[in-house]
Amino acid sequence: MAAILGRLGLVLHPDKTRIVCLTGGSEGFDFLGFHHRMVESSKHRGRFYLQKWPSQRAMASIRAKIRDHTARQLASRELKYVVQDLNPVLRGWGAYFRHGNSGRKFVIVDSYVHERLCRLAAVKHKERLRQWSKRFDYAWVTRLGVYRLTGTVRYWKPAHALR
């Protein structure tokens, strides 16, 4: 492999290059922000399919961005302006990761956004954080206009020449 790449003037990075056995679904690899792994079918035992979802690094990155946009220092701002700043971040991240098997990760990100906005509202209105689940439900988040990632996953469709 190194000889073929050498003729093309390419070199493999020894720290980043590793051989992964995908059979059996025991391990996977991260590439371009996605974690790729063979996953066994729930309907057909013994049949594996390659699936991809956002990697741990990608999840940590979006959590850090959400945390920055909902910091305690922003409690003096109106929530609609916080949401206006947060929505483009969520839209862009969701547009990149919506192709694949990202549904479960999208639910995690949505619940994290909900939690952070509730904490920010509780700090803003000087309420106890234990009471946030009663007052700040998902309907409240929807009324704020927060972009929801849940339900935005798109699956690849086969191309048809005559359609």
Locate predicted features.
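Non-catalytic terminal/accessory segments
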Residues: 1-163
